[in-house]
UniProtKB/Swiss-Prot annotation:
The name this protein goes by in its record: UPF0246 protein plu0566
A biological-process GO annotation: response to hydroperoxide
Organism this protein belongs to: Photorhabdus laumondii subsp. laumondii (strain DSM 15139 / CIP 105565 / TT01) (Photorhabdus luminescens subsp. laumondii)
Family stated for the protein in its record: Belongs to the UPF0246 family.
UniProt-listed InterPro entries: YaaA
Domain of life: Bacteria
Pfam families in alphabetical order: H2O2_YaaD
GO cellular component, one term: cytosol
Amino acid sequence: MLITISPAKTLDYESPLATEEYSQPELLDQSKRLIRICRELTPAQIASLMGISDKLAGLNAARFGEWHADFTPLNARQAILAFKGDVYTGMQAESFSNKDFDFAQNHLRILSGLYGVLRPLDLMQPYRLEMGIKLENKRGKDLYAFWGDLITEKLNEALEQQGDNVLVNLASDEYFKSVNTKKLAGKIIKPVFLDEKNGKYKIISFYAKKARGLMSQFIIQNQLTQIDRLVEFNLDGYAFDESLSKGNELVFKRPEQH
C-alpha cells in the first residue's frame, strides 16, 4: 500500500528532529532546472505568479537564491518533519518511532512542485512552489508539463518495491493531477472525509486536510497493507460510511464538532 499526500506551505526548520535518519531526493537534477528558472524571476514576478505578498515574495526569492543541491542535515531537513500544514498536524510525524519512520519511508510519498516526489526522510531545503502555478518552462506552460510522467514513474517504482498495486490517494486534486493515472500501475483508493455542519455532511477543507494526515498516521502506525483494514479508521471521531462509499471512494463521516 502506497500513500500519496500533498506538501504544505508552512515549514518548520527549528523544532528538534525526531530522527537522524535521512535520504536524498531522487529527482534533484530536475529540481535544479526549476531553480534556474525561478532565479530569473523578480520578487514582483514571484508575488504575481504565486498570489502572495511582497514580503513573502522576497523571502521566496531569497530561498531560490540560497538553494543548492548539496543537501546535508546542517542545511536541509527531512521532508516529513519540515512540512507543517494541516495534513502534517494530523499526522504528527514528530511522535513517530523508528519503526514508523521505516514503514513511512517505504509506503508514503509527498508530491512536490519543486522536488517531484519526496520520500519522508528525503532532505529538502525550504521552498514554495505550488504544483498548480503557471511557471513556463521548456516542456510547457506549467509544472504539470514540466514533470510529465516522471512523478508517475517514481510512484510505479515505489509500488513495485513495496509489493502490491494499491495507492491510497490522500493528496489534493491540485497535486494528484501531476500523476498520469492511465500509466499508474496501481489501483487508486480515495478516502473522503465528511464533517457535519448545521445538520448536513460536507467536505470542510481544514478538517479534511487534518483527516488526511490522521489517515496517513493510522496506516503507518498500524503498518497496514490490506485495503479492507482502511475501513477501521476511527481517529478523532470519524467512522466509515458504507452506504456513501462507492467504487474507489471510501467515505468517512464525523458528527459536528463542538
